[in-house]
Amino acid sequence: MVGSAFRRIYPDAESPTTEEFHNGLYDAKGKHIVHLAAKVGGVKVNTEEVGEFFRMNSIINQKLLHMAHHSEATKVVSLLSTCVYPDAPYITYPLTENQLHLGPPHPSNFGYAYAKRMVDVMSRAYRQQYGCNFITAIPNNLYGENDNF
C-alpha cells in the first residue's frame, strides 16, 4: 500500500531495469533513498511461495543496500512491515522495536517477513562496519485503497 500510494503521488516513478537501478544509485551521491521495493502478495501466495518471497526480497534488499553504500548515498530508510513481528507468546502489546527478533514471524508471511527482518539486520551491519546512515522504519498496519488481503 505504501508503494502504490507513492506511485499515486509520483506517477512518473517506475521500477527501473537492473542497469537503470544500478546507474541511478551510483549517481545518487548526496541523496536520500527511501527503500520501498519488495515482492508482495496476499496470504495465499505468501504461504504457497515462501521460498520465492524470501529469495526475491533478500536479493532486492542486498542489491539496494550494497549499491547505496557504494554510491555514497547519505541516508537509506527501508520500510519494513508489521508482519515482521513474532506472534504471542514472544511479544507483548503495545509492540516495540526491541521485540522484532524475539521469535519467528507468523507462518502466513514467513519468507517475506524474514527477508524484511534481514534488511533491518543488514542496515545495522552496514551502519556498524561502514558508518552508513541506513535505518529501518515499521509503519503501522493500514487498510484502504490497494490493500491485498
For the regions a protein language model found, what residue spans apply to each?
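N-terminal Rossmann-fold NAD(P) dinucleotide-binding loop
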Residues: 3-4
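Conserved cofactor-binding/catalytic machinery of classical short-chain dehydrogenase/reductase
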Residues: 32, 60-63, 75, 118-119
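Conserved Rossmann-fold NAD(P)-dependent oxidoreductase catalytic core, especially the SDR/UDP-sugar
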Residues: 62-109
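Conserved beta-loop-beta element that borders a ligand/cofactor-binding pocket
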Residues: 80-81, 120-145
